[in-house]
């Protein structure tokens, strides 16, 4: 077996079905398997997916939502491929994507993990697909807005690396878990995903450990996927916001805290707490405004339409 493709599903039948279909529409000369882990979906998506792909996909059904890292690890343990590909359920691959990436990995034995270009539905680059590690200084530039103010600066925008050409290939610190191809021997060396990360930063942590072990993480944009990023919509549940900021703190504690002074750690904790509070407040205000808008009378709604149309 050459590639084991691991997809985690949680209440996303349409997206997951499209992702799997795009995989089976691939033009490949190698053998691959698809392993789908369902995190206790409540929308009957697992039943529909099993009916649709029962002869072509291996299924793991969980009785609880175990999170992204733990579910992927279940798939990795079952996988037989030389390469393990983490593929988000809200993505679609191009017909040449798998072939291109396997060919690249076969010809670059020093590369431990690779990712392709990841595009959003509007055709713009998903900036998460090639990143620097979130050091305290990098995080400060990102949170303070300096990275947006100087997007082409290698110094101020070392997180999203917008100073680099998105169509050129190069080593990077971090790739995105939406499409992350890793060698089996790398996983045997550095271990599985850290299951303390429920749904964010598990890819960042993995890439950090891969790089620390002497392997290269590589951005290879000779092929691409589309990432629909369903979970990034506004009005997101509180749990998602909480898990993101909890994972941010966990990553800092795991890899950076012992390198920095108490004052730097205090700064990081304060920054994470403030960002969490601001995000929750913003989402709450958005929900309240949305609720108020939906409860408006038909006459008010028509008047609002007229104003927005310039009537």
Functional labels for PLM-detected ranges:
Residues 84:
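Short aromatic/hydrophobic "clamp" motif used to bind/position activated sugar donors
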Residues 22, 38-47, 64:
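A conserved acidic beta->alpha catalytic loop
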Residues 61-79, 100:
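Glycine-rich, basic loop-to-helix element that forms the pyrophosphate-binding segment
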Residues 94-128:
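Conserved donor NDP-sugar-binding/catalytic core segment of glycosyltransferases
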């Amino acid at each position: 077996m050459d590639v084991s493709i691991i997809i985690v599903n949680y209440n996303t039948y349409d997206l997951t079905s499209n992702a799997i279909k795009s995989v089976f529409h691939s033009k490949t000369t190698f053998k691959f398997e698809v392993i789908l882990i369902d995190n206790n979906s409540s929308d009957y998506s697992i039943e529909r997916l099993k009916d649709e792909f029962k002869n072509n996909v291996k299924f793991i059904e969980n009785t609880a939502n175990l999170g992204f890292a733990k579910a992927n690890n279940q798939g990795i343990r079952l996988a037989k491929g030389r390469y393990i590909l983490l593929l988000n359920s809200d993505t679609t691959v191009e017909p040449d994507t798998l072939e291109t990436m396997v060919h690249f990995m076969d010809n670059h034995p020093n590369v431990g993990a690779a990712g392709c270009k990841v595009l959003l539905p509007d055709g713009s680059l998903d900036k998460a697909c090639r990143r620097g590690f979130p050091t305290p200084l990098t995080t400060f530039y990102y949170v303070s807005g300096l990275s947006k103010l100087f997007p082409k600066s290698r110094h101020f925008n070392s997180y999203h690396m917008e100073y680099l050409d998105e169509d050129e290939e190069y080593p990077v610190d971090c790739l995105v878990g939406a499409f992350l191809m890793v060698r089996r021997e790398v996983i045997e060396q550095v271990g599985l995903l850290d299951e303390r990360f429920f749904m964010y930063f598990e890819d960042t942590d993995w890439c950090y450990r891969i790089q620390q072990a002497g392997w290269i993480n590589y951005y290879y944009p000779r092929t691409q996927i589309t990432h629909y990023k369903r979970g990034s919509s506004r009005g997101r549940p509180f749990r998602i916001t909480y898990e993101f900021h909890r994972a941010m703190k966990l990553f800092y504690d795991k890899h950076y805290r012992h390198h920095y002074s108490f004052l730097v750690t205090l700064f990081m904790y304060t920054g994470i707490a403030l960002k969490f509070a601001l995000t929750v407040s913003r989402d709450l205000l958005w929900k309240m405004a949305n609720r108020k808008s939906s409860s408006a009378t038909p006459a008010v709604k028509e008047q609002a339409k007229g104003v927005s149309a310039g009537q």
